[in-house]
């Protein structure tokens, strides 16, 4: 199925594709929302979702984008979920930590989706497009959680995404998040990495920096057309 066909079939979703809000004009009716997940492995169908964060993107009166609102949840593994010891060692997540205060997948996804739908309405956009560093990984886990809970109101496009690994490779010659941020002049603390919240906020800064740099170079000017 092509993206255009999907859009035609789902035109009623979101905040109204006909709006001329500058954000809707800039991204063809889509609202970029940065997402990062920390998981119990690489398989979205079998491995646990342990953390998820999302950052909505705003736009100022001059057409420059910026990170707006952050949503973050530690997530209880779904029943029967696989969790690889190597994944916990890599992320540093301690499932039995008394301050972890995890919530169910349903609570996390519903709260994030509620915030995304609010941002869609505010920006006159019809649907969110996931932005991620190696975005297919994050989108796969979002889609798997949606399928597990049979959620009917997923604001995200099911297969389109913006990948900051690709964008950073083009803009800065770097595809690793930490190195791409450093090349972009964004502070990055490796001790904070592999927290969904930290990685999402840094990915949002990187995405906005690339989009704004492109605009400054003349690549996007008349966002009212």
Curated annotation (Swiss-Prot):
CDD domains: RNaseT. Coiled coil: none annotated. It is an enzyme of class 3 (hydrolase). The active site is at residue 194. GO terms for biological process: DNA replication proofreading; tRNA processing. Residues 33-207 form the Exonuclease domain. Residues 1-21 are annotated as: Disordered. SMART domains: EXOIII. Binds two Mg(2+) per subunit. The active form of the enzyme binds two Mg(2+) ions in its active site. The first Mg(2+) forms only one salt bridge with the protein. GO terms for molecular function: 3'-5' exonuclease activity; magnesium ion binding; nucleic acid binding; RNA exonuclease activity, producing 5'-phosphomonoesters. Keywords: Exonuclease, Hydrolase, Magnesium, Metal-binding, Nuclease, tRNA processing. The keyword Oxidoreductase does not apply. Mg(2+) 1 binds at residue 36. The record marks 42, 90, 137, 159 as: Important for substrate binding and specificity. Mg(2+) 2 binds at residues 36, 38, 194, 199. InterPro entries: Exonuclease_RNaseT/DNA_pol3 (IPR013520), RNase_T (IPR005987), RNaseH-like_sf (IPR012337), RNaseH_sf (IPR036397). Pfam families: RNase_T. One of its GO terms (cellular component) is cytosol. Its EC number is 3.1.13.-. PANTHER family: DNA POLYMERASE III SUBUNIT EPSILON, RIBONUCLEASE T. Belongs to the RNase T family. Trims short 3' overhangs of a variety of RNA species, leaving a one or two nucleotide 3' overhang. Responsible for the end-turnover of tRNA: specifically removes the terminal AMP residue from uncharged tRNA (tRNA-C-C-A). Also appears to be involved in tRNA biosynthesis. Homodimer. This is Ribonuclease T. It comes from Pseudomonas syringae pv. syringae (strain B728a). The gene is rnt.
């Amino acid at each position: 199925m092509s993206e255009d066909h999907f859009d035609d079939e789902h035109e009623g979703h979101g905040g109204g594709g006909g709006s001329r809000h500058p954000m809707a004009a800039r991204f063809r009716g889509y609202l970029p929302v940065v997402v990062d997940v920390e998981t119990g492995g690489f398989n979205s169908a079998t491995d646990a979702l342990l953390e998820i964060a999302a950052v909505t993107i705003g736009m100022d009166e001059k057409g420059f984008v910026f990170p707006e609102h952050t949503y973050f949840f530690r997530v209880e593994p779904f029943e029967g979920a696989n969790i690889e010891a190597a994944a916990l060692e890599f992320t540093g997540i301690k499932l039995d930590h008394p301050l972890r205060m995890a919530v169910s997948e349903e609570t996390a996804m519903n709260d994030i989706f509620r915030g995304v739908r609010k941002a869609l309405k505010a920006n006159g956009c019809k649907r969110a497009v996931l932005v991620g560093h190696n975005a297919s990984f994050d989108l796969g886990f979002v889609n798997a959680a949606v399928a597990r809970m049979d959620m009917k109101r997923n604001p995200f496009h099911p297969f389109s995404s913006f990948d900051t690994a690709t964008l950073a490779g083009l803009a800065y010659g770097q595809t690793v998040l930490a190195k791409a941020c450093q090349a972009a002049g964004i502070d990055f603390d490796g001790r904070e990495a592999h927290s969904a919240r930290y990685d999402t906020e840094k990915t949002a800064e990187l995405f906005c920096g690339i989009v704004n740099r492109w605009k400054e170079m003349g690549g996007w000017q008349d966002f009212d057309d």
